[in-house]
């Protein structure tokens, strides 16, 4: 792979689901790579139509993607990855950078099922990447160096936060951020339902809850303070917030959330052992 981190070479993606489309949209958002330089494969046209309309090249042949692109994202379901790797093996060269976003599939598994010396990156995004507000972590395989890391980061930076981590943190990221989006939606639904119970119209409740979560998240990011400190700022002695928090404590909210992260992380680890 060329020594420059600036990517103008064709980018491929095997798989065209919602996460793949989100990552590709982020890549195209920068404008450095045109849709004509993106090639995507999927078994059927159902998920390819939107990308085709965007101007991307599409195919039903995974090997064609690898033959035509030097950077290739693997965006299939985890249980499909072994067959995909077997299929593309003859086409992968030392010039390729293979990037997997499949939950639970380790770097060791990827490297074992690709030609020796293959440059591999394992990434884990989350759903807000489709709006360029995601959180991505990644780890490099043994043969992927700083150049490959720079290429990867230059591609996905517009999708949101992007951080290189030890591989041991990727399954944890799956549990806290990949799955965490669903926890937040569940909490948002409960907040809105509480407002509806007290008499607020449902549409208004959802709008206010969404803005509340957005504002709280921005404050957490921008202030760099511990969540407990920000929470304490909202709690006046004898006020409404401390009464509400007391009910959350009685319901075991924090323990339940911690258990959810543990369960999802453990599941991701189990998937990697299969």
Swiss-Prot record:
It catalyses: L-proline + NADP(+) = (S)-1-pyrroline-5-carboxylate + NADPH + 2 H(+); L-proline + NAD(+) = (S)-1-pyrroline-5-carboxylate + NADH + 2 H(+). Oxidoreductase that catalyzes the last step in proline biosynthesis, which corresponds to the reduction of pyrroline-5-carboxylate (P5C) to L-proline using NAD(P)H. Proline is synthesized from either glutamate or ornithine; both are converted to P5C, and then to proline via pyrroline-5-carboxylate reductases (PYCRs). PYCR3 is exclusively linked to the biosynthesis of proline from ornithine. It is found in: Cytoplasm. Pathway: Amino-acid biosynthesis; L-proline biosynthesis; L-proline from L-glutamate 5-semialdehyde: step 1/1. Keywords: Amino-acid biosynthesis, Cytoplasm, NADP, Oxidoreductase, Proline biosynthesis. Its main location: cytoplasm. This is Pyrroline-5-carboxylate reductase 3. SUPFAM superfamilies: 6-phosphogluconate dehydrogenase C-terminal domain-like (SSF48179), NAD(P)-binding Rossmann-fold domains (SSF51735). The gene is pycr3. Its EC number is 1.5.1.2. Pfam families: F420_oxidored, P5CR_dimer. Belongs to the pyrroline-5-carboxylate reductase family.
